[in-house]
A protein has these predicted regions:
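ATP/NTP phosphate-donor binding region
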Residues: 1-62, 72, 76, 108-111
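Glycine-rich beta-strand-to-loop/alpha-helix junction loops that act as flexible
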Residues: 9, 65-67, 89-91
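Short, flexible micro-motifs
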Residues: 15-17, 69-72, 93-97, 149
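Short secondary-structure transition/capping motifs
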Residues: 38-39, 59, 63, 67, ...
Length: 172
């Protein structure tokens, strides 16, 4: 099964995309693994890419390189491909999914993401209607409504301001 890294360059405080890509290529060459790379360009792009990839090529091991939002998009995009596997390299602000594992895991290890054993994980399926259009999606660690959504929206806005990044955006 091919491993495909989906990289969100806007995750966390901004990912050094070229450096990450170089490291992924270096590790995959060492492991003699054929990998794919996709750098997202906008919100929703990770979901769209994973879905289209599955429709064209079938199952893959997708590695979401970003935060919880990127991971959620990849899970939603690959949701109709039952043999797809999902991994994560945490680059986001909170990385709540990864922090929920007591042992910490090898989430930051590119080699472990390529060679690791997969295990099943429960997901949350949600359905909503927005502007008259139905949407079904999936998330892996939490689903928020109300106040939490307002905080997340305000945090995203704060992170766009100069000198405000990471956890500081949540405090403000």
């Amino acid at each position: 099964m091919k491993t495909v890294f989906i990289i969100n360059p806007m995750a966390g405080q901004g990912t050094d995309t070229e450096k990450l890509i170089d490291k992924i290529k270096e590790v995959s060459l060492f492991l003699n693994e054929d990998i794919g790379l996709h750098v997202t360009s906008a919100p929703g792009d990770a979901e769209r890419f994973a879905k289209e990839y599955c429709e064209i090529h079938g199952a893959a091991r997708f590695i979401a390189c970003g935060g919880d939002g990127t991971l959620g998009e990849v899970v939603s995009g690959a949701s109709e491909c039952p043999d797809a596997q999902i991994g994560v390299i945490p680059l986001g602000t909170g990385n709540d999914f990864c922090r929920n594992f007591a042992q910490g895991g090898d989430f930051s290890s590119i080699a472990a993401q390529i060679e690791g054993e997969s295990t099943k994980c429960d997901v949350i399926r949600y359905c909503t209607t927005l502007n008259g259009k139905e949407k079904t999606g999936y998330c892996v660690n939490m689903f928020n409504i109300g106040f939490d959504c307002n905080v997340a929206d305000m945090t995203a806005s704060m992170k766009k301001k100069p000198f405000i990044s990471g956890s500081l955006a949540y405090l403000l």
